[in-house]
A protein has these predicted regions:
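Alpha-helical scaffolding within the catalytic cores
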Residues: 2-14, 116, 191-193
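Aromatic- and acid-rich polysaccharide-binding/catalytic face
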Residues: 8-46, 69-70, 74-79, 91-93, ...
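Active-site-proximal structural segments of metal-dependent nucleotidyl cyclase/transferase enzymes
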Residues: 52
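Aromatic/acidic polysaccharide-binding cleft in carbohydrate-active enzymes
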Residues: 70-195, 201-204
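Short Pro-Gly-centered flexible turn/kink motifs
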Residues: 272-284
Length: 286
């Protein structure tokens, strides 16, 4: 938007003393059918967050304030599949009762994008204190239901969200990652591997979330865990598909996570094979 981030600065200068959060919304889509560029969408999300945080801190400094304004990322997801169908409904079939609008059916590559966005949100957990999927059932949602009281079923994007919710509790640890990079149609210096770790002190668990967003090559990830003495490998969960456009349905959920034997520990050093275009959850515990 032409007014971004001036609008945020202007409104915060008038409201700084009365508010605690700035609301952010962002949806992404693969309208150009360019998977490599689509999977760089989390870089845009990262820059979006950094810009809003910088704006909040600028206003804090200008106001000689004492408090940080944090972020509530109220809406985020992939959203584009249903656009044409929705246009047809509104233009050619208006005034229906409960028409099936915004019912995106998500592909496996959408699940990778959602996983990348989750990693980005966790990386910014110091300032992103709230983050919501605004719609949970049917409407750009991880869960779908069939008309007439039929089955409920899980979309591809359900699983990265499940993993982050279940295992992403605790303290987010910013990893120091050395990785090769690539360029896409609209992005430069895109990291081949995106990752973040979460330490749950109460349960003595460490979880690493990682996405290999290259489309051609497996990558070996080496993790130095010598500072986490006593931790052992629990499991390595993977989502990967040869067909990036594969979807789930009420008849068959083809895209599901699986447990693999691709991680091993040796003297505090863990090596993990990240398959091409894959979502990985590596769990460790004492």
């Amino acid at each position: 938007m032409p007014t971004f981030p001036k609008w945020e600065s202007t409104t915060l200068e008038s409201t700084y003393d009365y508010v605690d959060y700035v609301s952010m919304h962002q949806y992404y889509g693969n309208r150009d059918n360019d998977t490599a560029d689509f999977l760089a969408c989390s870089d845009d999300m990262d820059e979006f967050i950094r810009t809003v945080v910088a704006t909040c801190d600028y206003v804090k400094a200008k106001k000689r304030g004492k408090k940080d304004i944090n972020i509530s990322f109220d809406e985020w997801n992939v959203w584009f599949h249903s656009n044409a169908a929705d246009d047809d409904i509104t233009q050619n079939h208006p005034w229906q009762v409960a028409p099936p609008m915004l019912e995106d059916i998500y592909t496996f590559e959408d699940a990778l994008a959602v996983g990348l966005m989750l990693i980005t949100l966790l990386k910014h957990a110091d300032r992103v204190k709230i983050a919501c999927l605004a719609q949970l059932v049917n409407v750009i949602a991880p869960i779908m239901t069939d008309q007439g009281g039929g089955a409920a079923w899980k979309q591809t994007i359900f699983y990265p969200f499940l993993h982050a919710s279940k295992y992403g509790r605790g303290v987010a640890l910013m990893p120091l990652v050395q990785t090769t990079k690539h360029d896409t149609a609209k992005h430069e210096n895109v990291t081949d591997v995106e990752s973040v770790a979460v330490y749950n002190e109460e349960k003595e668990e460490l979880t690493i979330f990682a996405v290999n967003r290259t489309l051609e090559d497996d990558i070996e990830l080496t993790t130095d865990l010598r500072g986490m003495e006593g931790f052992h490998l629990v499991e390595h969960i993977v989502m990967e598909e040869s067909d990036l456009k594969l979807v789930n349905s009420s008849y068959e959920e083809k895209v599901v996570p699986k447990t693999v034997n691709r991680s091993k520990m040796d003297g505090g050093i863990m090596t993990t094979l990240l398959g091409k275009a894959s979502w990985n959850v590596i769990r460790l515990s004492k």
